[in-house]
Amino acid sequence: MNFSRFAIIVFAMLSFIGCGGENTAIVDDVKAGESEPSPVDSALEARVAAMLGIGYPKLTNENAEDFLLDWGVENNQDFVTMHTKHGDIVVELFNDVPLHKSNFLYKIHRQYYSPSEFIRVLPDFVIQGGNSEEEKPQQMRYLIGTHSLPQEMKDKYVHTRGALAMSRSYINNPKKASSSYDFYIVTGRKISKHELASIELEKNIRYTSQQKRRYNEIGGTPHLDGEHTVFGSVIQGMNVVDKLAATPTDNSDWPVERLEVNMTSHSRIE
């Protein structure tokens, strides 16, 4: 359901409430004969409340971390499915990157990513999503709140093919804080042992033998290691990622066709 339809629903609700006391008796009569709301009605109300922020604080850099970690304890899910025109991508979220995991799940719960789109496609590198030039993402960011995320980088999570990570600004960001909305999935390319050794030396990184083997056999983008927080990995649907990555782009790496994505979270693989 798009934003305009939600707005119509809420406007109708507010108009009804604004009728005042003269209709109180009629409303009471209606209430007396009401049946219990159906599961569909309850689900719709929950989606409207989540999208419009009813009962949720507006997030800032001051309150976001505590709120998201607390929310994540009560709303923990381990998997996210990204539904696209080419098929589904299933991602596993890492439990030991709790803030980024909770943030992603919360934005899904608030309907930010339904729909959203992949807005940058860079061959042999990444596909990036979470923002667009359309009005809805800007409206939703205003409703949810503008904030960043303290980085949670871990040596064991690197940018091999299929890694899910958050984007970040490289300007005035010495602590490498993450965006709380923009994400990317790594496609990458195969990395030779010599090239990986150079990256280790340049970035003062020591890869495990397994990480070296994965970079050599399936590829990735190792120069992003130590720069962005990886918080999940594609476990199904990399062929779908490859189809999205093959989309023609303009000179700014924007796909020439809309690559819409809708997201759902769940506790097990469906």
Residue ranges and their predicted role:
Residues 1-7:
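Bacterial N-terminal signal peptides that target proteins for export
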Residues 7-15:
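Bacterial N-terminal signal peptides
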Residues 19-270:
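Cyclophilin-like peptidyl-prolyl cis-trans isomerases
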